[in-house]
Each structure stands twice: as structure tokens, then as C-alpha cells.
Amino acid sequence: MSTRNVMITDLDQPDPNQQQHHQNPKKNRKVLQTLSGNFNRRSRSVEVEVKRQDNLGVVHKDRKKDRSFNSLLQAKDQQLEQLVQRLATLHRYNDQFAKENDQLRKDSGQLERRLTEAEQQVANCSRCQQLGQRLDTVLAQNRTLAGDVDMLKTLVFRLNVQIESYQDQRRLGEGAPTCGGSTKVSSSSAPYPPLPTHTLGPLLQAYDESLRDKDALLAQYNTEFEHFTGELKRALEENTKLLQSQEQLRRDLGGWREERVCLQAQLGVCRSKAEAQTRKTDLAKEKLVEVMHCYEQRMQTLILDMDHLQAAYARTKSELAALKSASSAAPAAVAPPVPAESEALHQCKALLEQLRQEHARERTCLQEQLQATTARAASLVRSTEKAKHSRDRLKARLRMALQWAQKLEAGQAEVRDTYEAVRRLEVLVQHKESQLRGLHARNAEEMDKLRHKLQQKEETICALLRGKMERRPAVD
């Protein structure tokens, strides 16, 4: 057999970096001379056994590595499922918080409407207007009565003056002499006409009765005025209390609005964090898929290289057997030809060693990538823990908000007890509640659609990973 019939592939080409280690064979080993090349005097069964053990060791290492990689992939899948479950719970809690926020917003709107109604009722109080009108009428009557009293006082003063003058005239008339003083009396009593006593008594009695009636009216007006002032004071006190409660409710509503704004901002931050976490998980999944693709391509190239090496090894083995059989018939004194076959065998060994080193390097690279993915998973776990802590803080703040809502409900009960006219707003509230139910239903449908899309994405990713894992044993 000549050297022209030997097929030399790219795997049989020598490596300039590793050829130097195999150019100096051992001096004590005897070299047989053949037509196509030289080969060492070594048992073929021993070489086959060593080669088989090496192949078995490589196969066992590959299987162990595949098992470890499969276990790592399963662990990553479990971690991704846990992260998806946590994200689902986070979305559920966010929905609950949104519902509670809408409920509290609705309650605050009802309180504002009731406060406006109360203010309008206080401004348009018919009883207060009636009391004011009655007070005006009573004051006018009081002024008229004061004028009548002044007039009666002047009349009584005049009557008293006339009575005194009449008494003086009677006293003078009784003390004067009857005979000689008739002319003086007539002359002195001429400017004063005689007082009719039968008309003065009834007039005085009528004035006394009118005075008593006026006094009774004044006493009645005083009592009514005192009663009105007491009612006015009570109304003013109730008005001040209502104004204070209104101011307190406004302050509480202002604090609740600020708290609601803070909660909305924190909810937006949590949603952005959740979106960032989902994007990170998607990137991690994509990188895992890329690593799997690279690993499969490397394994395919290694399998092809091993097939080429086995074919070359079989060819060299058959050629060595043929040369060994032909060496018995060849003369012993033939000059040693060029050791081409031994060099090809050394090149194959060097190439195999190089492939092993490349395989080891690729394995280390894959291990580093797996460590990087584990570090990313740990960072994802830490970020989920941070999200959980933020969710706990939101729960605490929402508990505080619920306490404020309970206080507001207590204020509502007080306002409801004081003002019963709030029942007229029930129809409007029912209409608003129907609108809110429609909005909640629409929001729930949108959230269900988003969850369905997320589930479809997760199912496709899991199906891709399972397909890759199922193709892996088939390739092995």
C-alpha cells in the first residue's frame, strides 16, 4: 500500500504549536520499517483499551456536565416560575390597592358633596330666615311700644299737673269765707273751668287698663325676645360646631389627598420596578436560550471532530495492520523510509489533545456563564425582596389610610345625624357606583388580557426550553 491512497483531512494537518512536543520519540523504543511509514512496536489491544477508556472518560465527563447543566436549568426554571408567581401576587395586591383607592376616593367625593349640601342648607335655612323676620317685626313693635309709653308718660304727667291744680283750687275754695269772698273766688276761679269728675274716672281707668295691657305685651315681647335670643345662640353654637367639623373634615381630606398622591406615586414606582423585573427575566431567559444554542453548536462541532478523529484512527489502524502483514514478506535489509505515518499519528494525537483543551476551555466558559446567570438570579431575588418590603410599607400606609377612612366614616355618621337631607343624593350615588362598576369591570378585563398574554409568553418560553432539553439527550 502506497502513501497516495491515504486520505488526509484538515484534522490530519499538523499543529505548529504542539508538533514540537511529539517530534522527539523515545530512543529505547524500536521502530518498524514499513512501506507507508513507521509505527511503534506496541500491542494493538492495549492501544484500543486505552483509547476506549479515554473515550469512556470523556463521555462520562460530558454526561456529568450535561446532568449538572440540566439540574442548573431546572433550578433556573423553578426560580423563574417563583418570580412569575411573585409578580402575579404583586399585580393582585396592586389591583386590590387600586380598588381600595377607588373606594376611598368615592367616599371622599361623597363627603365633599355632603359638606356642600350642608353648607347650602345652612345658607338657605328657612327657620333662620323666619326667626330673622320675626326679630325684625318684634323690634319694630318694640319701637312703637316705646313711642306709646313715652306718649303715655307725657299724658300722665299732664294729668298729674291738672289734678294738683284742681286739688289746690278745692283747698283754696274750702278755706275762703263764704260771704265776702264770693267775688274773689269767682274772680280767681274764672280761668279754671270746673272739672267733671264723672268723666275723669273712666278716662283714668281706661288709661290704667291700656297701661296694664301694654305692660303685659312688653313682658310677652321680652319673653319671646329672650326665647328667640336663646334659640339664636343655640343655632350659632351649632353653626360654629358644624363649621369646626367642616374644617376638620377639610383638613382630613387634605391629608388623605396628600397620602393618596404619595400612594399613587409609590404604586407607579412599584409598577415600574415590576416591569423592570419582567424585562430582566426576559433578558435572562433570552441569554439562557442563547447559551443553550451555543452549547449545542459546540457539542455538534465536537461530535463531528470526534467522528473525523475516529475515522482517521480507523484508517491508520487498518493501514498499520496492512503494513504489519506486509512487513513479514518484505526483506529485512531495506533502508528505512520517511516516517510519514508516524508523523500523521502524532499529528492526530496532538489534534486530539488540542480538541480536549478547547473542550476544557469551553466548559470553563460555560461554567462562568452559569455563575453569571446564578448571580443575576440572586440579584433578581434581592430585587424581589426589595419589592416585597416596599409592598409591606404600602400595606402599612394603606392601613393608616383605612384608619383615616374609619375616622372619616365617624364624621360621616355625625353629619348624617345632623343633616338628614343627604338621602336625596342616593340616586346620584347609585348612578356613580354603576359607572364605577363598569370601570372596574373594564379594568378587570384588561388585567385578565395582560395576564393571559404573560401566561402565553411563559408557556412559549417553557416549551422552547423543554424542546431544547429533549433534543439534548437525542444529540448525546
UniProtKB/Swiss-Prot annotation:
Keywords (A to Z) from UniProt: Cytoplasm, Mitochondrion
Function in brief: Required for mitochondrial complex IV activity. May be involved in non-associative learning.
Entry's localization field: Cytoplasm, Cytosol; Mitochondrion intermembrane space
GO terms of biological process kind: chemical synaptic transmission; cilium assembly; mitochondrial cytochrome c oxidase assembly; mitochondrion organization; non-motile cilium assembly
Protein's organism: Drosophila melanogaster (Fruit fly)
InterPro entries, A to Z: CEP89
Protein name: Protein Cep89 homolog
Gene name per UniProt: Cep89
RNA-binding recorded as keyword: no
Phenotype upon gene inactivation: RNAi-mediated knockdown of the protein causes complete lethality at a late pupal stage. Muscle-specific knockdown is lethal under strongly induced conditions, but shows no obvious alteration in locomotion and behavior under mild induction conditions. Neuron-specific knockdown flies show striking motor defects. Analysis of synaptic and subsynaptic organization at larval neuromuscular junction shows normal overall synapse morphology, but a highly significant decrease in the amount of active zones, i.e. presynaptic microdomains of neurotransmitter release.
Biased composition (Polar residues): 180-190
Region (Disordered): 1-29, 172-193
Annotated GO CC locations: centriole; ciliary transition fiber; cytosol; mitochondrial intermembrane space; synapse
